[in-house]
């Protein structure tokens, strides 16, 4: 089953699900993508796949009708980060991210780089604390706050810099929605349907729990990509979210 469209702008989905692609071979990635419907999810392309296959992979996904979250977590000096974010916007991605720990000047430069794109600009999201990190990991870096406290501090800085939202764990979502308002988007990895293995994500939730917590976009990987019937798995997840709503 293959779904095609002329560009990512043709994708129409109200689903909050973003499927994380994690493939070492381009053909296998596209074979998986051709089994699912762009009306049921968006797709996330990370560092490994983008390094292996480059911008053409993003174009291939867009041609199939999918919105793409380019998950490269830019973290560099302000000018370099701004140019990278603008390049992502030129590529037509739906969402791009930076590390909030890059600081206010870097995030503001990234935001300003998207101004020429107006309504066609991608969502600009900042990463707070990686979901694989616990308190001991932060202590190793000299951060004495808990992951939740550090994430909230970085999220507040992100909002002050005018970005669209943050990547955060689902456990932070309720507090973040209260602190930063409904318009501030929350993107959450580590989302796994009930019965899935935790993998390398320490702070996880089910899709239904994440929706109740206030998550706007939930990233789901192997429970979908390794499913024997990924299209049905997506439909089941979306149906459960509609019931929860």
UniProtKB/Swiss-Prot annotation:
One GO MF term: orotidine-5'-phosphate decarboxylase activity
Pathway: Pyrimidine metabolism; UMP biosynthesis via de novo pathway; UMP from orotate: step 2/2
Superkingdom field: Bacteria
Keyword Lyase: yes
Lyase recorded as keyword: yes
Key words of the record: Decarboxylase, Lyase, Pyrimidine biosynthesis
Assigned GO CC terms: cytosol
UniProt record, GO biological process: 'de novo' pyrimidine nucleobase biosynthetic process; 'de novo' UMP biosynthetic process
Alphabetical list of SMART domains matching this protein: OMPdecase (SM00934)
EC number(s) per entry: 4.1.1.23
Alphabetized PROSITE patterns for the sequence: OMPDECASE
Active-site residues, record numbering mapped to chain: 73
Reactions performed catalytically: orotidine 5'-phosphate + H(+) = UMP + CO2
HAMAP family with a match to the protein in the record: OMPdecase_type1_B (MF_01200_B)
Its job: Catalyzes the decarboxylation of orotidine 5'-monophosphate (OMP) to uridine 5'-monophosphate (UMP).
Record-stated family: Belongs to the OMP decarboxylase family. Type 1 subfamily.
PANTHER family named among the record's database cross-references: OROTIDINE 5'-PHOSPHATE DECARBOXYLASE (PTHR32119:SF2)
Subunit relationships: Homodimer.
Stated name of the protein: Orotidine 5'-phosphate decarboxylase
Protein's gene: pyrF
């Amino acid at each position: 089953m293959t779904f095609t469209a002329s560009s990512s702008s043709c994708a129409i989905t109200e689903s909050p699900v973003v499927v994380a692609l994690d493939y070492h071979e381009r053909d296998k990635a596209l074979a998986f993508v051709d089994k699912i419907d762009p009306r049921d999810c968006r797709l996330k392309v990370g560092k490994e796949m983008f390094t292996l296959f480059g911008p053409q992979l993003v174009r291939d996904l867009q041609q199939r009708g999918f919105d793409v979250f380019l998950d490269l977590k830019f973290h560099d000096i302000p000018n370099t980060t701004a140019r990278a974010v603008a390049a992502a916007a030129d590529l037509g991605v739906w969402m791009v991210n930076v590390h909030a720990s890059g600081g206010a000047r870097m995030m503001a430069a990234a935001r300003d780089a998207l101004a020429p794109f107006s309504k066609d600009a991608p969502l600009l999201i900042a990463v707070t604390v990686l979901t694989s990190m616990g308190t001991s990991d932060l202590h190793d870096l000299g951060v004495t706050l808990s992951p939740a406290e550090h994430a909230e501090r970085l999220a507040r800085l992100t909002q002050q810099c005018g970005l669209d939202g943050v990547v955060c764990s689902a456990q932070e979502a309720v507090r973040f929605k209260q602190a930063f308002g409904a318009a501030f988007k929350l993107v959450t990895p580590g989302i796994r349907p009930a019965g899935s293995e935790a993998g390398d994500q320490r702070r996880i939730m089910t899709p239904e729990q994440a929706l109740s917590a206030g998550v706007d976009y939930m990233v789901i990987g192997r429970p979908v990509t390794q499913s024997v019937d990924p299209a049905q798995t997506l439909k089941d997840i979306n149906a459960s979210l509609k019931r929860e709503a």
